Amino acid sequence: MDYLPIFADLKQRPVLVVGGGEVAARKVDLLLRAGAEIRIVAQSLSPILEQLSQQGQIHWLGQAFAAEQLDEVFLVIAATDDSALNAEVFSEADKRRVLANVVDDQPRCSFIFPSIIDRSPLVVAVSSSGQAPVLARMLREKLEALLPASLGQMAEVAGRWRGQVKQRLNAIGERRRFWEKTFGGRFATLVANGQTAEAQRQLEQDLEQFAQGSEGTQGEIALVGAGPGDVGLLTLRGLQVMQQADVVLYDHLVSDEILDLVRRDAERICVGKRAGAHSVIQEETNRLLVELAQQGKRVVRLKGGDPFIFGRGGEELQVAAAAGIPFQVVPGVTAAAGATAYAGIPLTHRDHAQSVTFITGHCRPDGDGLDWADLARARQTLAIYMGTMKAADISQRLIAHGRAATTPVAVISRGTRADQLVQTGTLQQLEQLAQQAPLPALLVIGEVVELHHQIAWFGHQPQAEGVSRPAVVNLA
């Protein structure tokens, strides 16, 4: 270990900063957040530092560094572009046993700054001992994605309850088990969702049960949108919830790459729906959700796209609510937004479409109830989910209600994935395009489809209108 990682209390402690530029300003910002009393020496101050000086947040000692300025300071930072001055600062600090940091000059550092993930009061520091700062920064960025912003508030609440928990639970091991269950249970979810008062009540209830010898954990359901396929489109919140799951119920549309991000010891159950017997399968999914949550498990219902857009997520949460099970929803990038963006087809455009309508081709048995005359209006975009089997009926109805047979259309298969296929043509060719489209596929109808030939950017791109490569088929 080249450096001992410690956390220093700088509140109201004098710290000297030599330098007045942007680098010095960044260090000053960090020191202010730690509550330090900042003294600064510089020929001139950057606008930010000058403002801080005028506000009395820092004390500008003068333009020239003098060794006696180090007397009684806790540490010093040299952040100038004068290497000789930086060396002098370090030398004088070393003589006085004052901790010193010369920016970007590791040999002249008795301490170094780590990369910081700030979830105050929870703080994570990452360091490569100055050997690979870019690597440390990259690791910090990965940790930033994994650590919810609510951790700080969670730690604050826990800090306020430490005394009461210690009074109620005498044994150290007992307290440890309590906090492990608390931080991994309903309390954490409530804090993350901004329900602080409810979180306090939950913690009080959990403590009472624990003190009475009942360590039962309340189960919950998280409805999570996995996005259209590309793992990079999964939200940070979705990733965090998935990595806390005990059980994951997922659909066929969820990619293997996204499933690989689920907590490794979580149980995975595929509840994907195929054509036929949908009500029975959905009822079984509803039963599993309730049953598993009632066992005290954190259940993630992982759905492709967004769970509230043609995903029957609302129906599943109605069942959870009726059973009295807590739940939360994590939205996802819906297929119509993701697939069209990756195909270079804007859903709206000032010159072509002032509105967009999402439709499902998989309707209830008693009919679709759609206003086809309204859907046939020009200058709008239709995005149709699960519509390949009804493509012929869709095109016939739209044409019959006045939409031009030459209206541009696209069928996007496996949108946002590496093997994405985009087929384009006209409304009268929609059935032919849909018949040869791999599933899952999205139908897009409207003049905006023409822009695909100009701004397609992902995967194989069309060379010109009427000319195609393997991943782009044009029947127009």
Swiss-Prot record:
Ranges for region Precorrin-2 dehydrogenase /sirohydrochlorin ferrochelatase: 1-203
Keyword vocabulary terms for this entry: Cobalamin biosynthesis, Lyase, Methyltransferase, Multifunctional enzyme, NAD, Oxidoreductase, Phosphoprotein, Porphyrin biosynthesis, S-adenosyl-L-methionine, Transferase
Keyword NAD in annotation: yes
Positions annotated to bind NAD(+): E22, V23, Q43, S44
GO BP annotation list: cobalamin biosynthetic process; methylation; siroheme biosynthetic process
Positions with a binding annotation for S-adenosyl-L-methionine: P228, G304, G305, D306, I309, T334, A335, M386, G415
E.C. code: 2.1.1.107, 1.3.1.76, 4.99.1.4
Pathway terms, separated by semicolons: Cofactor biosynthesis; adenosylcobalamin biosynthesis; precorrin-2 from uroporphyrinogen III: step 1/1; Cofactor biosynthesis; adenosylcobalamin biosynthesis; sirohydrochlorin from precorrin-2: step 1/1; Porphyrin-containing compound metabolism; siroheme biosynthesis; precorrin-2 from uroporphyrinogen III: step 1/1; Porphyrin-containing compound metabolism; siroheme biosynthesis; siroheme from sirohydrochlorin: step 1/1
Keyword Phosphoprotein: yes
Catalytic activity: uroporphyrinogen III + 2 S-adenosyl-L-methionine = precorrin-2 + 2 S-adenosyl-L-homocysteine + H(+); precorrin-2 + NAD(+) = sirohydrochlorin + NADH + 2 H(+); siroheme + 2 H(+) = sirohydrochlorin + Fe(2+)
Sites bearing Phosphoserine, chain numbering: S128
Active site residues of this protein: D251 (proton acceptor), K273 (proton donor)
InterPro entries given in the database record: 4pyrrol_Mease, 4pyrrol_Methylase_sf, 4pyrrole_Mease_sub1, 4pyrrole_Mease_sub2, CobA/CysG_C, NAD(P)-bd_dom_sf, Siro_Cobalamin_biosynth, Sirohaem_synt_dimer_dom_sf
Gene Ontology MF annotations: NAD binding; precorrin-2 dehydrogenase activity; sirohydrochlorin ferrochelatase activity; uroporphyrin-III C-methyltransferase activity
PROSITE patterns hit by this protein: SUMT_1, SUMT_2
Protein family according to the UniProt entry: In the N-terminal section; belongs to the precorrin-2 dehydrogenase / sirohydrochlorin ferrochelatase family. In the C-terminal section; belongs to the precorrin methyltransferase family.
Reported function: Then it catalyzes the NAD-dependent ring dehydrogenation of precorrin-2 to yield sirohydrochlorin. Finally, it catalyzes the ferrochelation of sirohydrochlorin to yield siroheme.
Name of this chain's protein: Siroheme synthase 1
